Amino acid sequence: MSPPAVDIKVSTDAPPKIVKALNLLGSTGSIGTQTLDIVAQYPDRFRVVGLAAGRNLERLIPQIRQFQPEIVSIADPEQLPELEAALADLPQKPQLVAGEAGIAAVAAYGDAEVVVTGIVGCAGLVPTIAAIKAGKDIALANKETLIAGGPVVLPLLQEYGVKLLPADSEHSAIFQCLQGVPEGGLRKIILTASGGAFRDWPVEKLAQVTVADALKHPNWSMGPKITVDSATLMNKGLEVIEAHYLFGMDYDNIEIVIHPQSIIHSLIELQDTSVLAQLGWPDMRLPLLYALSWPERIPTNWSPLDLVKAGDLTFRSPDHQKYPCMGLAYAAGRAGGAMPAVLNAANEQAVALFIAEAIAFLEIPRLIEMVCDRYSAQNIPNPTLEDILAADRWARATVQELAQRGVSPMVAL
């Protein structure tokens, strides 16, 4: 048989099975457990060197027994005796560390080639920097690292010659679509959003939202913080800032569209108006696996996308009145400097207060707007890491102060 007219260099041979060593930050969370599912399914491709977790020992201890890491970190040093006792029968015991220094130690530890950052929030920034300085590639599932720390992280990637690969669905989709696109060929990034728990609610009903309502995501299984962010569409606003840093795209050329089915994970428009998209069932393991295996494609036995079963794919413009957080994120991104760090910290704190039932749902964007307005006059254009961490602390304290005084819910910008 003659060779094909178009040589796309498809190999029917399985890729060489090189075991890749991983350090996993946030092992007991949603990203962490799904990453370990991948490791368990492909033990001939991946091995765990280090685990960093929070306070969930009930979930962490079985992970240690199954994956046998060399080092383990937990958030609370007071839990170390309990963890040591639970592992007393292990013939090979991991090194146990704790606190913020412990997370950074795991991030930089040993012969791990890749660090998966699954820690929620700005807490992932310092350990990610530690991993970069140790020369380890980053599978980024913690968007706040770039949102808050972009001005610091990007130069460090260049300085230490490490790769940062997106491990969340939207930015992985963009990254996959960009494979083979020549420099200068990208015109626009289109981020798709499910619309969250309240996509079909009228604006007037949002004043009645409960925490339980906000945590009912229609498509994805995620942690509570990111599920609330999806309900406010702040998640997508933060992803706009992340896309700006990841792909160097101007904010005017990053668009958000509501796509309720969550089958198209994002799209790119090229200079000739061609549009490329990445499709798949809503499954976080897919972008995680690609970030871990890139540039390879590892065969899986997961359910492939069936377009007939998927049915109609629909799109609509987001409602700026319903989703004011989206506009706040664009404004913070355009302001640059430390302002995205302030936006992110204010959002984290406001969402935590909402989940604790200390504020109403509509107070989340109002608090964020007030904090960003206060900070605008003191924004630092080229912040250091210390500047970013100081801005983060200031924003959290200011949210607490404003919440204690009481705020009026904002419906529209």
UniProtKB/Swiss-Prot annotation:
Its cofactor is Mg(2+); Mn(2+). InterPro entries: DXP_reductoisomerase, DXP_reductoisomerase_C, DXP_reductoisomerase_N, DXPR_C, DXPR_C_sf, NAD(P)-bd_dom_sf. Mn(2+) binds at D168, E170, E239. Keywords: Isoprene biosynthesis, Manganese, Metal-binding, NADP, Oxidoreductase. It catalyses: 2-C-methyl-D-erythritol 4-phosphate + NADP(+) = 1-deoxy-D-xylulose 5-phosphate + NADPH + H(+). The keyword Transport does not apply. Pfam families: DXP_redisom_C, DXP_reductoisom, DXPR_C. GO terms for molecular function: 1-deoxy-D-xylulose-5-phosphate reductoisomerase activity; manganese ion binding; NADPH binding. Pathway: Isoprenoid biosynthesis; isopentenyl diphosphate biosynthesis via DXP pathway; isopentenyl diphosphate from 1-deoxy-D-xylulose 5-phosphate: step 1/6. Its EC number is 1.1.1.267. GO terms for biological process: isopentenyl diphosphate biosynthetic process, methylerythritol 4-phosphate pathway involved in terpenoid biosynthetic process. NADPH binds at T28, G29, S30, I31, G54, R55, N56, N142, E144, G223. 1-deoxy-D-xylulose 5-phosphate binds at K143, S169, E170, S194, H217, S230, N235, K236, E239. NCBIfam families: Dxr, PRK12464.1. Belongs to the DXR family. Catalyzes the NADPH-dependent rearrangement and reduction of 1-deoxy-D-xylulose-5-phosphate (DXP) to 2-C-methyl-D-erythritol 4-phosphate (MEP). This is 1-deoxy-D-xylulose 5-phosphate reductoisomerase.
